[in-house]
Amino acid sequence: MAVSDVAGSQSRYDAVLVGAGIMSATLAALLHELDPELRLLMVERLQAPGLESSAAENNAGTGHAANCELNYTPLQPDGSVATAKALAINTAFERSLEFWASLTEKGKLLPQQFLHLVPHISVVFGDADLAFLHQRFQQLSALPAFASMQWSTDAAELAEWMPLVMEGRANAESVAATCIKRGTDVDFGLLTRAYVKSLQASGALELSCGCEVVHLHRLGKHRWNLDLKHSSGSRSVQTPFVFLGAGGGALPLLQRSGIPEAAAYAGFPVSGQWLVCSEPGLTARHHAKVYGKAKVGAPPMSVPHLDSRWIDGCRSLLFGPYAGFSSKFLKQGSRLDLLRSVRRSNFRSMLEVGFKNFDLVTYLLSELQQSEKDRFETLKQFLPNAQLNDWKLSVAGQRVQIIKGTAEGGRLQMGTEVVSAEDGSLAALLGASPGASTAVTVMLEVLQRCWSERMASESWQERLQKLLPSYGHDPNSDPLLLMQMRIRSNELLSFT
């Protein structure tokens, strides 16, 4: 993958994207499809794209479609479950599939390299959680987006869906599961690099790795200067648009930008670990993503799940994540990241969130104290016949949850949020899950905010309709449209 020589590169670009992860790569791909003449610069402090949060070993890779993640359908006081978030996430993932299908049709992506069809299963144990899962099944399966969802409490059928989970389990134990066969596993690191490779081949994108943004400031309306530091030297570049898509590193850069919209934000870093199995005899027998129910007080990223994964083309099983706390904002960051992010404008919000979420802090600290035996006992709740020597511990990526100052005080937010300058000259993506799976939808939001005139133009609207045939329509209110979207994606992405 070609990397530019900093000293010899040009200094003016139509857009500069900081961080070479799935978000920046998706935005670059969209911009190029909408206007092939745009000159784009992507800056990455590591030595290649997609090595931080987008790397397969650093995220769940589920292809989040809300098929199996129970935290997206919380139980309500009246006994029902909320479905709005699940529907929104499902729609966003269908849009990602739609975009990948279009680029595949153009010969720019090879889906078999990064995308695998894997059933998505939700499993619960015990009568109380069975009632919750059955309520979720009844409500979701009545919606077109989840109409293919299956329900079972039959031990023989469950053993077909997830043999390793059922083997060695007591017959008297209450177990229930739902299953959607059209689930996916996505290697977002490989997808990121595929985007970048295609963009470089077109001549539209300059990639600068091993390069950090040391300073950014406004030169005037719709004009930014970024000072870049590289092993081979330094330079300054100018652009009318900056996107900060650096994962946990986006918040410090947003703060350095000085835009008033950044003042209300802070970050709460959460770390994680996986147990990984590469034994062929086991990986060949588990073909599903099996999600359980999070412990009370646990953050969403700690929902236990056992996943079939393809990491750089090799099949493995991942179980976890085991949550923890680190003051780093990036896996390859500094332990001073959290301290350096404290500002007069966000200090009070950070304290308020700490007090309001003391149970969460306590939970994370308790997870840090877990021994190898403790982690293995958690695994055995999912896999009764698990053997310790088949599994090794691996560190997952860092997630920086959003702390936002509001009229009611500091609030801890799960999910992602786009923060942009009033004039649309700068945008940043903060937060975490569901993240990568919704990249196309989130980057369309960035374009609506920051490229609004171009987005409203006839030429861009025509290109958007070709790229995303469902653009401007809600498939949740049009079952025929949803069916057409899925038929097209299934065919072009070779879902069989």
From Swiss-Prot:
State one molecular function term (GO).
L-malate dehydrogenase (quinone) activity
EC number(s) on file: 1.1.5.4
Please give the superkingdom of this protein's source. Bacteria
Q: Which Pfam families match?
A: Mqo
Q: Which GO terms describe its biological process?
A: tricarboxylic acid cycle
Question: Which reaction is catalysed here?
Answer: (S)-malate + a quinone = a quinol + oxaloacetate
The record's listing under InterPro entries reads: FAD/NAD-bd_sf (IPR036188), MQO (IPR006231)
Q: What class of enzyme is it?
A: oxidoreductase
Do the record's keywords include Flavoprotein?
yes
* Needed co-factor(s): FAD
- UniProt keywords, alphabetically: FAD, Flavoprotein, Oxidoreductase, Tricarboxylic acid cycle
Q: Which pathway is this protein assigned to?
A: Carbohydrate metabolism; tricarboxylic acid cycle; oxaloacetate from (S)-malate (quinone route): step 1/1
Instruction: State the family named in the UniProt similarity comment for this chain.
Output: Belongs to the MQO family.
UniProt protein name? Probable malate:quinone oxidoreductase
Q: Which organism is it from?
A: Prochlorococcus marinus (strain MIT 9303)
